[in-house]
């Protein structure tokens, strides 16, 4: 198991425009040839947008983009004339396929924090697609079959345990709270990368009963 701590992430964004970013993988102007991807996962970015800030319309292709809002509200607009407001607990997926344009902005009055994860599809091309799941439950994994991946959301009270799925590649990102994974304490922004995961368990590790942890766990097959 390889643990990457929150402070190890690459900073990015444009603070003068109200945007602060933290990148777990090489991204934009930050290039590390030893940290390009893990399994199908190409990016895990934590984005902080001040009220009124955002990413203007831009193009994506051949990428599966999954977004998880931590606090605030994210307004998504795309080239299919779709406008969606994504809130905490919602999961948004954009399949960019052969090409799609979209914008992401904080049109609310409170700061916005979201985690956005990019995955490589097994086959390029195809038609763009969009999906949103409102208030996804812990027991409902979300499949991204085009990337051979499954996302599991785990919310744990202190002392509560949950099995981690077995998989060729497993990536865990702590959104909030504290957990133990294979005896290693992980805090917000920390992540773990595990190959050939078998029989692992997450345990909530908060100091108080209301210190619930939230973890995003990607279960990924061997790249196709």
Describe the predicted segments one by one:
Residues 1-224:
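Jelly-roll (double-stranded beta-helix
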């Amino acid at each position: 198991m390889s643990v990457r701590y929150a402070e190890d992430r690459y900073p990015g964004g444009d603070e003068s425009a109200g945007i602060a970013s933290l990148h777990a993988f090489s991204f934009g102007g930050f290039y590390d040839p030893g940290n390009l991807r893990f399994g199908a996962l190409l990016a895990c970015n934590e984005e902080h947008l001040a009220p009124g800030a955002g990413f203007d319309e831009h193009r994506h292709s051949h990428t599966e983009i999954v977004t998880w809002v931590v606090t605030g509200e994210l307004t998504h607009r795309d080239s299919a004339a779709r406008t969606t407001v994504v809130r905490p607990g919602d999961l948004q997926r954009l399949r960019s396929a052969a090409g799609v344009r979209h914008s992401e902005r904080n049109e609310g009055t409170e700061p916005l924090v979201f985690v956005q994860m990019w995955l490589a599809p097994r086959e390029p091309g195809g038609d763009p697609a969009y999906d949103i799941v409102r208030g996804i439950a812990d027991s409902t994994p979300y499949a991204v079959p085009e990337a051979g991946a499954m996302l599991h959301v785990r919310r744990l009270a202190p002392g509560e345990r949950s099995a981690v799925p077995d998989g060729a590649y497993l990536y865990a990102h702590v959104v909030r709270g504290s957990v133990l994974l294979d005896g290693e304490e992980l805090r917000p922004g920390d992540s773990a990368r595990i190959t050939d995961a078998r029989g692992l368990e997450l345990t909530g590790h908060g100091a108080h009963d209301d210190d619930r942890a939230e973890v995003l766990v990607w279960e990924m097959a061997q790249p196709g």
